[in-house]
């Protein structure tokens, strides 16, 4: 499905006409605990905590012979049963599955637009240290059980990784003015 220039200009007009809420700035003195941080309440300390950890993304495509629907269903419903406790055991702060279908990627294809990243999904991990992530990858349970399960739905030859830090500018419709990391 292609997005026409008309729809793009309509989206721009709609965004311009929408009233933007005033940003709030709250001073953070004490770091918040994970129990105090939730996606429905803006707390600067929660944002600062997230900016201090490593954010790793693994992009990959589905195994040949399975549909996007089969890939997404298996990953969301089966693989999480195998991998969930494993991630908790290593102290992963957050694990998120990013599901992308060909139809969703087609929505990005516009004349003159940037090339679309052709991956069916990405697993995202927020970990306290790189050693945490490396230990996960070398753990026998990962090698023997999780990798075997991934073979049911992932084309391992397509896998690509990136690591970095989040630098959050807007959180829950609030401008973020205090950061857990600085870039100089």
Language-model-detected regions and their locations in the chain:
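Fungal secretory targeting signals
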Residues: 1-22
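Macromolecular interaction modules
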Residues: 18-184
């Amino acid at each position: 499905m292609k997005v026409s220039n008309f729809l793009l200009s309509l989206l721009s007009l709609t965004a311009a006409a929408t009233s933007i809420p005033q940003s709030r700035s709250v001073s953070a003195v004490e770091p918040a605990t994970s129990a105090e941080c939730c996606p429905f309440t803006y707390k600067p300390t929660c944002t600062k905590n997230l900016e201090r950890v490593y954010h790793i993304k693994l992009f990959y495509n589905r195994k040949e012979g399975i549909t996007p629907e089969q890939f997404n269903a298996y990953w969301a419903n089966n693989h999480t049963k195998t991998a969930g406790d494993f991630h908790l055991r290593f102290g992963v702060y957050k694990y998120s599955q990013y599901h992308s279908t060909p139809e969703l990627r087609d929505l990005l294809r516009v004349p003159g637009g940037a090339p679309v990243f052709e991956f069916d999904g990405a697993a995202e991990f927020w970990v306290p240290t790189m050693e945490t992530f490396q230990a996960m990858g070398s753990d026998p349970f990962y090698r023997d059980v999780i990798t075997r399960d991934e073979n049911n739905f992932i084309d391992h030859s397509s896998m690509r990784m990136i690591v970095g830090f989040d630098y959050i500018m807007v959180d829950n419709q609030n401008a973020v003015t205090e950061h857990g990391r600085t870039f100089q």
